[in-house]
From Swiss-Prot:
CDD domains recorded: mRING_PEX12
Peroxisomal matrix side: 1-5, 63-102, 194-238
Binding site for Zn(2+): 289, 292, 309, 312
Main function: Component of a retrotranslocation channel required for peroxisome organization by mediating export of the PEX5 receptor from peroxisomes to the cytosol, thereby promoting PEX5 recycling. The retrotranslocation channel is composed of PEX2, PEX10 and PEX12; each subunit contributing transmembrane segments that coassemble into an open channel that specifically allows the passage of PEX5 through the peroxisomal membrane. PEX12 also regulates PEX5 recycling by activating the E3 ubiquitin-protein ligase activity of PEX10.
Name recorded for this polypeptide: Peroxisome assembly protein 12
Pathway entry: Protein modification; protein ubiquitination
Name of encoding gene: pex12
Zinc finger (RING-type): 289-328
InterPro entries: PEX12, Pex_N, Znf_RING/FYVE/PHD
The organism's taxonomic lineage, starting at the top: Eukaryota, Fungi, Dikarya, Ascomycota, Taphrinomycotina
KW Lipid metabolism (keyword) present: no
Quaternary structure and interacting proteins, as annotated: Component of the PEX2-PEX10-PEX12 retrotranslocation channel, composed of PEX2, PEX10 and PEX12.
Subcellular location: Peroxisome membrane
Single annotated GO MF: zinc ion binding
Length: 343
C-alpha cells in the first residue's frame, strides 16, 4: 500500500481547517444583511457545523472509507495490518475486507476526530469566560462572608472553590491543547522518517492509516453510477467537492500573491524552444510514467509539461534537484516545480 507524502498529509489537514472559518465568514456576511433570520444560526454555528459535519463524514466514511477532504485528494483509510502488502498480493479480497472500516470504526473515528476537539474547545471557552473575573469574584465573596451568617458563609466557600476549580480546569485544557500540538509535530517527524504509518494520535489509537485510493483514480465511471443511487447523497457530495475546490483555489491564489504580481506586471513564464525528446511519442506511451515505466498513478505535472507518478517525481527531484527526467533541462520555477493533478 502506497502511503501519501507528508506534504500531502499537511495539505489535507490545511484544507480541512479552512472549511469551518470559510463557512463562518459566509454566514457572518449574510447575517449582517439579514440578522433577523440568521443571527440565531450564527450564534449556534459551532453546534450546527458539528452536526452537519458528523452526518456528512459518516456517509463518506461508510461509502468510500475516506472523509470528504481525503476523498478529494484521492486517499482512503484502512485498518493497519502487519505485512498488509504481502497479504494483499496473495489474498486480495480477504485483505480488502479485513482492512476496510466497519460501522464501529467509523463511529470511533468521528468521536475522536470531531467530538472530542469540540468538547475540549467548549470547555476551555467556558472556563475562559470566568477567568478574568476570578480575583474579583473571590474578593467579593470573602467580603460578603463577614456580613452574613454561617449558612451563607458555607455557600460562599463553595462558590470560591468552584471559581478556583474553573481556573484549574482552564489551565488543564490549555495544557492539553499545547501538548497535542507538540505531539502532532512529533508524529509528523516520525511519519516523514518512515518510523510510523500514522499521522496523528487519533489514527494511532484507532489503528487507521491513510493510503492512495488507486481504485478511485482508475474507476471514475463506476463511482459516477454509484453516486446516482441516492439523489440527496449525490447532491451533498458534489456540493462539498465544489466547495473544496473553491477553497483550494482561493487559498492557492492568496498564498502565491498572484494579484500583486499581476499588478506589477511580473510574469513567471520562461520562453523556451520545444525540447528534443530522446524517444518517439505515440498513443501507447502517453499514460506511461517516464521514470518507473508503468501506468501513471496519482499524476503530477512538472513545469516542463510532462506528467509522472506523484511519488516518482518526488523521489526523482530529491536525487536530481531541479532537473527534468525527460529533457534534462533545469526547471525555471525551483520553488514550485511540480503540481499534483486532481482528475
Amino acid at each position: 500500500m502506497d502511503s501519501p507524502s507528508l506534504l500531502e498529509v499537511l495539505q489535507v489537514q490545511q484544507v480541512e481547517k479552512l472549511i469551518s472559518p470559510s463557512l463562518r465568514f459566509i454566514l457572518a456576511y449574510f447575517t449582517h444583511r439579514y440578522p433577523r433570520f440568521l443571527l440565531r444560526a450564527y450564534n449556534s454555528f459551532d453546534g450546527i457545523y458539528l452536526l452537519v459535519k458528523l452526518l456528512l463524514e459518516k456517509s463518506q466514511l461508510k461509502k468510500w472509507n475516506a472523509t470528504s477532504v481525503e476523498r478529494r485528494f484521492q486517499l482512503k483509510r484502512v485498518i493497519a495490518v502487519r505485512d498488509s502488502s504481502i497479504i494483499a498480493e496473495e489474498f486480495p479480497q480477504e485483505s480488502e475486507s479485513a482492512t476496510s472500516l466497519n460501522g464501529i470504526d467509523v463511529l470511533k473515528k468521528l468521536f475522536l476526530t470531531y467530538c472530542i476537539p469540540y468538547l475540549l474547545e467548549k470547555c476551555e471557552s467556558l472556563t475562559t469566560v470566568k477567568e478574568n473575573h476570578t480575583a474579583v469574584s473571590i474578593l467579593s465573596l470573602q467580603a460578603r462572608d463577614k456580613q452574613k451568617g454561617a449558612l451563607s458563609v458555607f455557600y460562599s466557600k463553595i462558590k470560591i472553590l468552584l471559581v478556583r476549580l474553573k481556573k484549574i480546569l482552564h489551565f488543564v485544557f490549555r495544557l492539553i491543547r499545547k501538548s497535542n500540538t507538540y505531539l502532532q509535530w512529533l508524529y509528523y517527524l516520525l511519519y516523514a522518517l518512515g518510523k510510523t504509518p500514522y499521522t496523528n494520535l487519533a489514527d494511532h489509537i484507532l489503528r487507521q492509516r491513510v493510503i492512495y485510493n488507486v481504485e478511485n483514480i482508475h474507476s471514475r465511471k463506476l463511482i459516477s453510477t454509484r453516486e446516482k443511487s441516492s439523489l440527496l447523497t449525490s447532491i451533498a457530495d458534489h456540493s462539498m467537492e465544489g466547495f473544496l475546490i473553491i477553497i483550494q483555489l482561493i487559498d492557492w491564489w492568496q498564498s502565491n500573491n498572484y494579484e500583486s504580481h499581476l499588478k506589477k506586471g511580473e510574469v513567471a513564464f520562461t520562453e523556451l524552444a520545444p525540447p528534443k525528446l530522446p524517444f518517439e511519442i505515440n498513443v501507447s506511451t502517453t499514460d506511461i510514467c517516464k521514470i518507473c515505466g508503468e501506468k501513471i498513478k496519482n499524476p503530477a505535472v512538472l513545469s516542463t509539461g510532462f506528467v509522472f507518478c506523484y511519488p516518482c517525481i518526488q523521489v526523482w527531484l530529491q536525487r536530481h534537484p531541479f532537473k527534468c527526467p525527460v529533457t534534462n533541462l533545469e526547471l525555471s520555477r525551483k520553488g514550485e516545480s511540480f503540481w499534483r493533478l486532481m482528475i
